[in-house]
Curated annotation (Swiss-Prot):
This is Nucleoside diphosphate kinase. The active site is at H116 (pros-phosphohistidine intermediate). It is found in: Cytoplasm. Pfam families: NDK. GO terms for molecular function: ATP binding; metal ion binding; nucleoside diphosphate kinase activity. GO terms for biological process: CTP biosynthetic process; GTP biosynthetic process; UTP biosynthetic process. Belongs to the NDK family. Pathway: Purine metabolism.
Amino acid sequence: MAERTFIAIKPDGVQRGLVGEILGRFERKGFKLVGLKQITPSRALAEQHYGVHKERPFFAGLVDFITSGPVVAMVWEGDGVIASARKLIGATKPLEAEPGTIRGDLAVNIGRNVIHGSDAAETAQFEIGLWFQASELNDWSPSDQGWRVEG
């Protein structure tokens, strides 16, 4: 199976109508969407998701923000998708993100940086399992697969 990553369009991205733009960037890159849903996360889900930041001063605000509205949760699949997605997304601080990246083009403030992406294989596995049931992920082959990747 190809590598998978978890991507979430945060409430600011949903409210600003950026879902289609962001989905398009991943599709044009050639990655395969295997899971997609819109959900307003519970506090429990948000606290689990951001658990690594529990002792940080911004934790409560982060949880409040991510639970403030709908999030579009996605699982993308493809060769090197985790590293490639991180490049597509750009630096966490939008003012440090390169033009052409999602955050470089669409975000201004670290507290409203539009999107989350897993940073490693272990994180992706944890986040996918947290946000999705196995039955919600679709194993399928695009008809243009031979035009996307060699082999």
